[in-house]
Structure formats: structure tokens, C-alpha cells
């Protein structure tokens, strides 16, 4: 009894659910296996005020949907095709139960409850107890629904009973969640790919400022949220984002329209269905808001509600996504066969006919056939059509031609959703076929068991659907992934206005391959696109104008990232594309061009051989080498002349060789620096200069020691010979070699490409490795130069031909000036000028040394040969000896006078302070009558005229002073064939000064030829005072002797010999000889 009651309860519930749909709102046919279907035959329902004062009535569906009816027809066509096919489910018949969802969740749930209730009744096996005459088989799978929001509600209910649901148009990514929607599958791609494709299109057209509108349901919200994520990754900014629905009130619609009208974004992304978007489009059309580009999701990209000719000035040029079109052979003919009298199992045919031909079908002979008893239910609970607008239409004849009317129903050129429906039915049929052909032991269930096709249950079909794999009629592989999604691609369509009938047509302008590599997924044929206003030019939808190549986008504070200012790339960076977000840095050896659009190779700069500056320095260096070689050649050719001998020939040769090295070392600083030139140039320069200065130092110090030595002994001759001189030069140079060796071993210099000095130039320079080592190298050179300068300055009063002191002093001054100036110049320059400064310093110092030390001698050798003689050298030496002796005499005379003054002084005459070079024509001592009166010799008497003394005119007698005057003294000195006479005059009585002549070292005295016979060379004689007219010969002195070449004169100890010069009462005197005149002022200096 309990089971019987339960049977009637469930049967009543099923009957109520079925009766909610009138006979004209169902399509149903018997079969061995029943498939359910949910299709939007209407776009919505009429809103009624449910005050609950009477029994609530089922809502009335309004606004017929021709596309929805075509989708329904696709399901029926697929079932009939399968039933007639011997390959699929032979000996079995598929039936169907199809309901109208009216594009609402409530109507969809009514139909779903009917499926669930009928399945529950069937699962109880109540037929034997209930004796039900009208048994309705279970619905083992449901095809539908359309909208994602509707499918979400249906899937939640069907999933409780594991009834498979295969949707043909619900693309929301939320439905991929298998934890929530266990039995949901679909033959349409996931919206996640569609959102990515939308972002790719916006990026393709270089838009970055868009608005978004989404349906306020499970389709629009997830879709637009995914789009925001993709847009953010591509730096696409969203100006506004609004939610709408077909039930939005007027105020909400007005507010959204105001936002669209005031926005500067011209591209609007819409994730919505046609019914949800329609109210908004109508208001935009009313306000005539044009110039917008609509980016349509698949749900409304081909919606007949929006694609209306009267809306084209607003929605024309829309870019939308369409599912890949499929081919259904025979479907066109099937659509044309629809007729209310022939389609006995399709309760929707009557309304379709009336809506197509705008007429009204009467019941009876002329009307449609009575519905099948299987569809008959409680009419009072069904939808009442008495209030339908069709009641006021003209009567239909039933002879109307469906092919003569243009409706979306007959638009089968691009079968997208219809093909998805077709594919969904075939998917279920192939799952049933797998069950039908299952071999025990290989099945999908426990122990490889198989389901019974005659008693198959919904959950068993779901299991086989998840493992489905078959080939469609188009040759494509059909299989569902773990999320129940079917792989698929999108076609990109563009809304055009047909020139033939003025309708909106959808032209395919590209495609989007979901599974291609990133960057290769999107293809668009720009030439086929027609934009809003029939324009072919891509619209501008950016917050800011494009930043051209050479600039980058700069963020404006407080504005979205898409609102930016164009900032020029800094030097050294470039951008070669429009709207670059950042400038790329040029490689190290490159620099940005003037427009910063690309990088060009940096200019390589170094002190080149071919540039004017390098050529000039090279010419000066070559000139220095040539001059040095010329001087060396002159010295070698005239090596036996007195001047060359007097300058120490061997050291001079070595000095000239070092100068050649100095000039040559400057060439290592010119040309592109290489590692080997960098390692060689500083040591070559340092060692060459140290060798040069060492030669000058040893040479100058040797002459100084010889002339200042009181007794030149064999010790001097031994230790100041050539061996010691070269040893000292080597030791001084060896120290520099050690410094260079340590430098090259610890931190060797190397070539270096300097990018930091100037942006557009690479300076190839030498990195010195260690500035400290360079400092030691130059410092040691300067130390030797300072010592050399000290000795040169100390020997500045030596005989002119030995002395090179004046010129050495000048050369050292030049050397110090050059290198002192070099330090700040070196520190303040960079690049190739560093090498140039050092080359200039090397050349200047080298030329200074060469000119000061050698040019004067070369000039005498070549142009003044008369001065390059033994006599000239000896006279110069004699002048130096006289000068030293006279200075000593004057100094001692002053000391004696100071002592006499301290004892009371004398009554002599005032000393004369004038010294002149004149002949003594008056005898200053009249009281003494000389035996012979002679005229004094001229003060500057050359060796030649010294042999032929001029006769002296008689002196004029002068009155004798009362006091006794000292005698006048005249001394003669013989040098070989020359005679030098000097005179001393005394005017201070009773004063005696004694001076000893310093020992001298006469070298390089050549024998003079006299009648082809060698004359003996005689040394300097000691000076003695005698009578006025006395003449001392060399024989009387006993000190004469030959002096050979490079032979040193041995002198007695001055303390044991007679005074060299005795001057009595000395105050005023003149010493002349050898072309020189020594005065009192000179002796006092």
C-alpha cells in the first residue's frame, strides 16, 4: 500500500512538472532510450505580479526565438539520423523530451525536475505495482542548456543524480569545476580561451583604453573577470566596468548609458547574451551614441536581437567571436520540411509557423493535428494562448512556403550552435554505442564489467562520456578533457551591412586557434574589416597618443598606467617600436642614434698614425731620431778633435744612443694600443731617460771632481776611468730596470676599452696596471735628474769646454719644467690625449737634452773650427786657473787688510775700485826708473800675437809721490807655441798676499805642428812676481814637461813649492789671457 501511494505521489509530481509546459511548449517522442533537451524557444517570460491571492500560474514565455527553434530542430534531426543509421545503436530507438527554457532559470528548472522525477519513478520499478498504463522511460542524458547561468542551475540539480548534461552553448569557466558540477560536459570551448582571445585582439590593434560590460550572471561575471586578468598582463586599462541584465530597471540602464557616453574609451568589451544586452542597445540607439567599437563574446556575436538593421549605425563594425562553423548534411532540407501538420511530435511547430508567417492557426481540419496523447496533460495548468497576440492575426492557410521568408531559422550558412547541438547528440549516441558494444571483461566498471544497454542508467552513460573518443562527420576527433570541455577554436566575425537586402551579415575576418603557440594563435585579415561608420581605418582607443619609436611611456601620477606621457629615451638607450614601455640599453660597443630608434657602433678613438696630431708627433719623433743620429755621426767623424775628446767621447756616444731610445720610445704611444705596446712603452721611456740622465750625471760629476781635486793622484786616474763610469751608468739604469720588472710581473699594463669617458666614443687606452709603479718610475727618473742638476749647477764655473754645466743646467731645467707641467696635464686629460701629453713630454725633454748638450758643440765643430783647437782648450783652462788664483788672492788681501785695520790701519792712498782692460801707458811708480821702458801688452792677447810682442812706447814720466810705491809685476805663461801675458798693478804699499795655485788636470791637449815638427806641450807655470820687465821662461821654472793625449799632469804639493802668485800691496789688477778677461767683480762673485 505504501509503495502504491508513493507511486501516485511521484507520478503526480511528474505530471505537474509536465503540465507546466503546455502541449505547444514541448517536443516529445517515444523511444527505447530517452534524451532530454533544453532550448530557449523564447527569449524571456512575461513579468506578472504574483500577489498570491489566487493559485500562482506558470509564467508565460514571450518573444519567439527562431534560432532556438533551429537548435531544437538540430537535436531532432540528429536523433532521427541516428535512428535511421544501422551503424549506431542498431535495433534501438532514441526518443526525446525537449522543453523550452524561455531563457530563464525557473523554466529550465521546471523541465529539469521533470527529468529527475521521471527518472526517480523509473528507478523504483513501480510499474508492476502501479499498473501505470503510460510508462515514461528515464532520461539518461540532457542536451542543454544555452546560457551559462541556466546551465549552472541545471547542472547543480542533475549532478545530484549523476545525469549527464551536455551543453552546446554554455561556456562559463565556472562550469569546468568538476567538484561542483560532476555531470556537466560541453561541446563549446571554455570562456577562459575567449577572454584571452579578446585581450589578444585588443593588443593586436594596439588599443589600451577600453570599457567592459557583462551580464550579471554566471556567464558574464567570470568571463569579464578573466578578461581583466588578461588585460592587466598586457597593460590594457579599463575605464569603466558595468553589469547588466535583461531585467535591469530603467534607472540602471540610463546610468550605464551615461557612463558609456562620457567615457573616452571607444572600445567596449561585452560578455553577455543577446537578451541581457538588448535593453542597453535600445537606449544607446535612442540616444544615437555612435563611434563605438563593440567586442562581442560568442553569446551575442550573432544574436538576432542585436544584429538588426535599425541598430547598425550603433553596432556596425562589431568584432565578435563565433564558434567554428560545422557542416550538417541534409539539415537544410529538414528545416524546410517543418510544418505544423507534419511535425506531430514537435509541439513548438505551431507557434513557429504563426511567428514566421504572422498568422493564426485554427484548431480543426485546417489546423494542426491533435497532439499525441503522450503529450496531453492538464490543459488548465498549461500556458494559455487565448491572450496571445496571435489571436488577432489573420488565419494561416497551411500552404505557406517556408523558403520564401527570410528568418534566422533558415540562416544555415554558418552553423555554429546548431552544429554543437548535433555534436552533443552524437556524443551521447557514441557513449551508448560503447555500452552496446562493450565486451565483458573490458568494460569500464568493476572487474571490467559492462552495462546492460536495455537497462542502462544515467551514471553509466556519464562514465562512458568521460572516456569518449570518436571522429565526427567533419573528420575531427571528439573527446572531453578532465574538465568535461571539448577542444575547439573561434572564428572572428565582423558585422557588415548587406548591400542586397540591408540586413546585417557576419563576415569571417580571422580565426583564433586555442591550442597554437602563444603569438601564433590569432590571425586577422585587416583588409576585410569594416569599422563603425563604414570606415576602413582602425579606430583609436587609447588614453594617450602612441609613443613613437625613440620614446617610451612615462607614467602620469594619479592616472592609470595606460594614461602616460611620451618620454624620449636617454642617451645610450633606444626603442624601435611604438608604445615601448621601456627603452632598451645599447650594447657596450654601441650608442643610440640621434632619434634613439636604434643603436650605432661607437666611434673608436686612439692616437692614430693617420690623424694630423699623430702625424705631427710622429714627424717630431722622427726628426729627433734624425738629429740625434746626425749628431752621433758628427761626433764619430770628429772624434779626435779637442771638443769631442774634452766631452768624454764614450759617454757622449752612450748619451746619444740613449737619446735615440728616448725619441724612439715615444712612437710606442702612437697607434692602437695593444697589450704588448702597453707593456713596452712605459719601461722603454723610463729606462731610456734614466740611461740618458745617468750618462750626464757621471760625466758632469767626473769633471767636477777632477777640477776640485787638490792633488790628482793615481786613485783618481784609476777610479774615474771609463770602466767605473760605465759601471755607475749601469747601476743607475739597473735600478730602473728592476722597477720595471717588478711592475710588469705584479701589475702589467694592458689595453683597455674605456666606455665611460664619452658616451659616443670608445677610447682604447693603456691601463697602467699600477699608478704607484708609474710613480716610482717617473720619481726615480726625476731623482737622478735632480742630482744631475745639483752637480751641473755646482760645476757651472768650470772651464767652458769641460763645463757643459751651463747647458746641462739649462737642459735639466727644461727637463723639470716639462715633467712638472706633465703631471697636471696628464691628470686633467683623458682618452688619446693622455698618450699625446706623454709623447709631447718625452719629445720636449729629449729635444731639450739634445739641444742644450750637443748643438753648441756641433755648431763649433761644423761652423767654428778655429775654436776646436788645443790652444783654445788650454786658454779656457788657463782663464779658469787665473780666475781661481786671483779670487784666492783677493780674498786673502781682504783678510789681511781687515787685520791691518784692526791694528791701526795705514796712511796709504785709497784703494782703487776700478778694473779695466786697458794698456798701462803711465808708469805708476815714477820713483823707480826702469832700465827699459816698455808698453804693456794688450789685455786680450791671443797665442798667435803673443809670439810677436808689440814694441812698447816710452812711458811719460810722472811725478813721484812722497811715499814709496810697490813695484809693478808682469808674468808670462807659455802654452806650447803660445804666450799669454797678464799684468798686475799694485797701489797699496806694505801689503803682501800669497796664493797657491790649485793643481790642474790638463787633458786632450794635442800637439801643434810647427814646420812639420811636433812642439812639446808644456803645463801651466806657477806665477811669480819679479821686476817689471823680467820675463820668465819655461826653462827657468823647471816645471815644464810634455803632456800627451789623455794623460794627466802630475803636480807637486803646493805647500812644498814656491808660491804660485805673490802679490804685494794688491788692490787693483787686471788679468787677461786666452780670450778671457777676469775682473775684480768676477772674483768677488
Swiss-Prot record:
Homodimer; disulfide-linked. Interacts with VCP. Interacts with ARRB1. The modification Phosphothreonine is found at residue 889. Residues 1-19 form the signal peptide. GO terms for molecular function: amino acid binding; calcium ion binding; G protein-coupled receptor activity; protein homodimerization activity. This is Extracellular calcium-sensing receptor. In resting state, adopts an open conformation, anion-binding promoting the inactive configuration. Upon aromatic amino acid-binding, the groove in the extracellular venus flytrap module is closed, thereby inducing the formation of a novel homodimer interface between subunits. Calcium ions stabilize the active state by enhancing homodimer interactions between membrane-proximal domains to fully activate the receptor. Upon activation, the homodimer adopts an asymmetric configuration of the 7-transmembrane region that primes one protomer for G-protein coupling. L-tryptophan binds at residues 148, 169, 171, 298. Residues 638-649, 700-723, 791-806, 856-1085 are cytoplasmic. Belongs to the G-protein coupled receptor 3 family. Phosphate binds at residues 67-71, 416-418. Residues 791-806 are annotated as: Intracellular loop 3 (ICL3). Ca(2+) binds at residues 82, 85, 88-89, 101, 146, 171, 189, 191, 232, 235, 298, 490, 558.
